[in-house]
Amino acid sequence: MANIFPPNTNKRFYGIAALVALAAAFVLGGIYYVNFSIPEYEPVQPVRFSHKLHAGDLKMSCTACHSAAQRSSRAGIPDTKSCLGCHQHILPDSPLIAPLREAADPQYPGYTGEPVRWVMVNRLSGHAYFNHMAHLNRGIGCTSCHGDVAGMERIRAPRDARMQWCLECHRNPAPHLRPLEETASSHYSAADYLRTHSIRDEEGKSIQTPLQLGNFLKRQWKIQPKTDCTACHH
């Protein structure tokens, strides 16, 4: 019986198969390295709030404003009344505070009652899930993900927020672990902490280095982060 396929059919088949395999590799690679945040995204906010001043110079803890991070999946943005809780006494007449008073101070001449519309900076893809409470309560500090907030005038999205970045921490969490009372500090240094705190491991040996401290906390809290898909994707 005569061959109904042209002589180069096999070559075409293998060529198409190779292209499909290459495309699949690019897709899977793209998923692995996908950016969850827009690189260097640093939007202008309706109120000129300086993280450098508050978290840096004044050394306020992150949870002083983002208290929801300790009890829910989202860190949240403080409501305007929380801001005025401080600023009704501190620089209340500053023009920088005016948008807050317009939104939440009925005694202010320019009061409108319109809420301040903050611009979201850190936005995960719809298929990814991150729980702030779970990380903070297991010794992961805010700066491990958000970077040097104490040095930022305007908050910006982390440059390396990729799946690979998350997996690297889940596979080796010890370098990122810190005592629970230090998770919301932008100034924490494990070396400085060990200079002022005497900590001994299970055998009574003195812990001397940051890595020893991280590994000790990992053992104490029995931390074994998941690395399968369902850990972050639901």
List where the protein language model places each region.
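Aromatic-capped interface at the extracytoplasmic side
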Residues: F26-P43
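Sequence context surrounding c-type heme c attachment/ligation sites in exported
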Residues: P43-D93, N131-H234
